[in-house]
Amino acid sequence: MSEQKDRAAQIAAYMASDGPLTPFHGEVPPAPKWFTRTVAVQPENAFVEVEAAKIHYLRWGDRSKPGLLLVHGNAAHAYWWSFIAPYLAQDYNVAALDFSGMGDSDWRKSYSAERFAEEEMAVCEAAGMFAVSEPPVIVAHSFGGFITMLTGAKYGDRLAGTVIVDSPVNPPGRPGGPPHRTFKPHNVYPDMAKALSRFRLMPPQGCKNLYIVDWVARHSLKQVEGGFTWKFDPFIWQDFSIGDTAARLRETKCRIAIFRGAESILMPPEIGEYMFNLLGRAAPVVTIPEARHHVMLDQPLAFVSALNALLADWNHSVPNRRI
């Protein structure tokens, strides 16, 4: 309990400090050419209805190619993948979704892991990923990885595989999960500069690629009366349960791989080893050097290279067994 209290105090201090974008006063940080080139690639913007909610997704590439669904984490959105997707779209029909209550998707009165899993499958369907001979792969970060563990357990017979990115399944007795949350409406900030100054990565971490932090922060905001506020529903987690992630991991019906950031506070080596054992020591655990929890933000090009290598292996080999 004291560890949870200490963590909550650390997060409170982190949230009270100046955000990493404060020194830019609303200006866009300088970015390398690879980044400006990839985000200039315009995806298809589309929606699919799932249980009376419009689910937004972005899509890149040729629909005749194998499908690759990219899934964001807690309170995030599809644009977390928009500087990654164009590299993958050379070989895949790539889509990135906004879960309900996040990004540009509709909010719901209540949320569940099962409904989020349905949203993943609905976007795969809408993006044409089940219209080709090869089933799709889902790549999912953080909270999205927990949902994709359920998707792999329930719908894995329709998937070629899942890649779980820094989504820790903790052994019994190890403290885990978020600290106590306060549920209240978002603040409204008078201008974009002030709103950007309040953006933080969670769990607390730095990121040297501030041009990426700025990109995802801008796409996290919407204009409302009086200024700008966050897009995600602040009440998503009020009655939400993630369920038994260890059981779902073991029940996966398709190929699976685990990615972790070498410097991630959520997935130290022993957690990767624990998940490796849960999967019968038959699924790869890939470590991205110099990356913290937000692997794609910290080391985007290394992440692309590692993912392409994994997918190339999956495309040219037959698993000894389904995990």
Predicted feature residues:
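Catalytic histidine-centered segment of alpha/beta-hydrolase-like enzymes
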Residues: A291-V304
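Conserved alpha/beta-hydrolase catalytic His-Asp/Glu region
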Residues: G176, P190-G243, A247-R248
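Conserved loop-alpha-helix segment in the C-terminal half of the alpha/beta-hydrolase fold
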Residues: K253-A291
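Gly/Ala-rich beta-loop-alpha elbow adjacent to hydrolase catalytic centers
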Residues: A140, G144, T148
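Flexible "cap/lid" loop of the alpha/beta hydrolase fold
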Residues: M149-A153, L159-M192
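Active-site loop/oxyanion-hole signature of alpha/beta-hydrolase fold enzymes
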Residues: V50-A53, L58, A95-V139, S305
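Conserved HGGG/HGGXW glycine-rich cap/lid loop of the alpha/beta-hydrolase fold
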Residues: A53-D104
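An N-terminal hydrophobic leader/cap segment in hydrolases
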Residues: M1-F47
